[in-house]
C-alpha cells in the first residue's frame, strides 16, 4: 500500500512513498448516492461484491421524481414512497397553446426525491454496501498503476464541516455523481 504525500493541486500528479498504512479496500467504489449510484451499489452488494457507496448527503436534487410503472416494478419500489400518480401531462407554450400528452400504462408515479433517494441508499446498505457520507476529491494510482485510490473528505458531524481526508483502494470506480461528474472529468479529461 502507498500513502499520498501532501495535498493535491490542480493539474498536478500526487507523489507517493512506500510507507505502509492501512487503507480500506473495496472491489468497487460508487461515487454518488442518487438513484443510479444507490441501485448500482445495491446490485453489486447483492452479488457479493465489496462496494463502497460514497455520497455527499444533505442536499435535495431539483428533479420532478417521475417514475414509470415498469421501473417501479423492476426496482421493487414500495407503494408508500409514491406521493402521487399522474395520469396525464400537459405542455403549455409561451403563447398559451396547450398539448395534452397521454401517459402510457395508466400512470407515472411521483416520489419525493429526498425520501426516495435515502430509501435507496439505506436499501443498498442493508444489502451489504458500505455507506459513507463524504465529498469525492480525486483519484490517484500507485506507481505501477494497478491500484486505484479514491480520496474524499469526510463530514465532521459535530461541526457539520467536511474536515478530514480519507482514502480507499479499489479495482473499479463508478461515477454516478451527476451530469457534471467530477469522476468523469478526472478520468476522461476532455469529456
Label every model-predicted segment:
Residues 37:
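N-terminal Rossmann-fold NAD(P) dinucleotide-binding loop
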Residues 70-126, 133-134, 140, 145:
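A conserved beta-strand/loop capping segment in the N-terminal third of enzymes
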Residues 43, 123-191:
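Predominantly flavin-linked oxidoreductase catalytic cores and closely associated redox partners
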Residues 23, 97-100, 160-167:
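Short, mixed charged/polar active-site loops
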Residues 20-34:
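Beta1/beta-strand and adjacent pyrophosphate-binding region of the FAD-binding site
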Residues 29, 42-63:
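Glycine-rich FAD pyrophosphate-binding loop
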Residues 3-8:
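Short, Lys/Arg-enriched N-terminal segments with co-localized hydrophobic residues
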Amino acid at each position: 500500500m502507498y500513502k499520498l504525500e501532501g495535498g493535491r493541486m490542480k493539474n498536478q500528479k500526487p507523489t507517493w512513498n512506500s510507507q505502509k498504512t492501512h487503507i480500506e479496500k473495496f472491489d468497487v467504489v460508487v461515487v454518488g448516492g442518487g438513484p443510479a449510484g444507490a441501485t448500482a451499489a445495491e446490485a453489486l452488494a447483492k452479488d457479493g461484491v465489496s462496494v463502497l457507496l460514497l455520497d455527499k448527503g444533505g442536499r435535495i436534487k431539483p428533479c420532478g421524481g417521475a417514475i414509470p410503472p415498469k421501473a417501479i416494478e423492476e426496482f421493487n419500489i414500495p407503494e408508500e414512497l409514491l406521493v402521487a400518480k399522474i395520469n396525464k401531462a400537459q405542455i403549455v407554450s409561451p403563447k398559451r397553446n396547450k398539448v395534452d400528452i397521454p401517459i402510457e400504462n395508466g400512470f407515472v408515479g411521483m416520489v419525493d426525491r429526498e425520501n426516495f433517494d435515502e430509501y435507496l441508499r439505506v436499501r443498498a446498505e442493508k444489502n451489504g454496501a458500505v455507506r459513507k457520507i463524504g465529498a469525492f476529491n480525486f483519484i490517484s494510482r500507485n506507481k505501477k498503476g494497478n491500484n486505484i485510490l479514491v480520496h474524499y473528505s469526510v463530514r465532521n458531524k459535530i461541526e457539520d464541516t467536511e474536515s478530514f481526508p480519507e482514502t480507499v483502494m479499489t479495482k473499479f470506480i463508478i461515477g454516478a455523481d451527476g451530469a457534471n461528474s467530477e469522476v468523469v472529468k478526472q478520468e476522461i479529461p476532455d469529456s
